[in-house]
Amino acid sequence: MKVAIVGASGAVGQEFLRILAERKFPMDDLVLFGSERSAGKKYTFKGKEYEVKLLQHNDDFKDVDIAFTSAGGGTSAEFAETITKYGAVMIDNSSQFRQDNDVPLVVPEINAEDALNRPRGIIANPNCTTIMMVVVLNPIDKLSHIKKIHVSSYQSASGAGAAAMAELQQQYKELVETGKVKTIEKFPHQLAYNVIPQIDKMTENDYTKEEIKMFNETRKIMHSDVRTSATCVRVSSLRSHSEAVWFETERPLSVEEIREALKVAPGVTVVDDPQNYVYPMPLESAGHDDIYVGRIRKDLADDNGNTLWLTGDQIRKGAALNAVQIAEYLIKVGDVK
């Protein structure tokens, strides 16, 4: 099996290399693609050095079986036909195709079978905040249908890419050395010692595109009529996102019911002993595959409401790992060989 990574030099592209090696993904060959800026860079995978090729409209994907793409929506839109025309399955990490009716949007723990119906040869990887939330909420939805969700996200700098992480570190350095921040390029404001209540562009209804994604993607993945109201916030941590989630179910659920369902849910680790200061934190979830969940409690304002706190590594489960799990499912069921 031949695998391609498009956007190999980025934060998610590099995570693809680590995860494919860690999980011993069944592949015989690897090819890396990137922009003019990245072409020529070399990376080691399983002891062998690979050079990044310039992504072009040619026959480079002729023998590729699976292509993981994480180079932005514009690149995905431009090169989708080039990538898939010889039969490669394109698993795309951008937002470009997520709401297209003929492109499945997949979280393997929830709707893996949707990946088998892909008329364009494309499978969309959901937004990181959506993935983390639905992995936790789907087992609860099986207990009683979730009608409404309110969520506030606390999203680290790495959600905006490797350059954004570097900018945050540079801002802290400038504050120590001069007392002022000079470098503000990847964020609309200084992020160091700050939080920014905007991720992505504002829409006409004053929700950001990130927040609208959570509404639409949750419905598509869970095959649900659930309504989600989100506030997405950038915080000055480097890696791992967190979310405070309130949800209303059709019937009241006890904390014990929820906790027991989550303990056996795939991709979830319950960390919930708040009386002893035990709860999920981004420092602890960074570098791990599971979504950590805790602070599970009844909502004081709604008898059918509960609330919880979750955190997870958005570069792993929120991006690269989820895509690799999709590919593993396709191989497992014999859809890709």
Model-derived features: where do they sit?
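N-terminal Rossmann-like NAD(P) cofactor-binding subdomain of oxidoreductases
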Residues: 1-191, 227, 260, 291-292, ...
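Charged docking surfaces used in two-component/phosphorelay signaling
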Residues: 67, 157-337
